[in-house]
Amino acid sequence: MYAGYRCNIDGNHESFIAKNGKTYMEAHHLIPMSAQDDFENSLDVDANIISLCPVCHRKLHHGIDIDDDLRRLFNSRVELLKQSGIEITLVDLKKYY
């Protein structure tokens, strides 16, 4: 909803054109759905869903050098998350990764 088919880590990252005619991106829950029990409000909301190119998506799941990326994503979403009733600090977000 917020990304316009661009990678939220770096809007210049390129991907291929999908069958729907849009640049292919992957949806990722910034706060993982596996953490839902730690939150009163649903994590499955637009404010918590980010758009990532396939490489950045894999990096967040499997990479070791993700602190800068998490900080950038957190800073871009913290206010939207609050508006959705989801309160989290960067320190706590990093614990899920």
What do these predicted ranges mean?
Residues 1-28, 53-55:
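Short cysteine-rich loop/turn motifs with clustered Cys
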Residues 31-94:
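Polybasic, low-complexity binding patches
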Residues 97:
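PLD/PLD-like phosphodiesterase catalytic module centered on the HKD motif
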